């Protein structure tokens, strides 16, 4: 019984290791939506920025429309 539990725990740990190693850049658009932002066109690219109300936060730059709210993109 203890051996089965140990095997189950080890397989779970291996699974979590593989899942956490997934390339996070592939999910940039999904992560953007998780931050609560609405996507907007930025620098001629399709939907690469997000709308921030009032002004862009630190670490972000204006890259698109000014009205009704600025379109911002992360620097870097």
Curated annotation (Swiss-Prot):
GO terms for molecular function: toxin activity. It is found in: Secreted; Nematocyst. Keywords: Cleavage on pair of basic residues, Disulfide bond, Ion channel impairing toxin, Nematocyst, Neurotoxin, Secreted, Signal, Toxin, Voltage-gated sodium channel impairing toxin. It comes from the Eukaryota. GO terms for cellular component: extracellular region; nematocyst. SUPFAM superfamilies: Defensin-like (SSF57392). Residues 22-33 form a propeptide. Its main location: secreted. Residues 1-21 form the signal peptide. Disulfide bonds join 40-71, 42-63, 56-72. Belongs to the sea anemone sodium channel inhibitory toxin family. Type I subfamily. May affect sodium channels (Nav). This is U-actitoxin-Avd7a. It comes from Anemonia viridis (Snakelocks anemone).
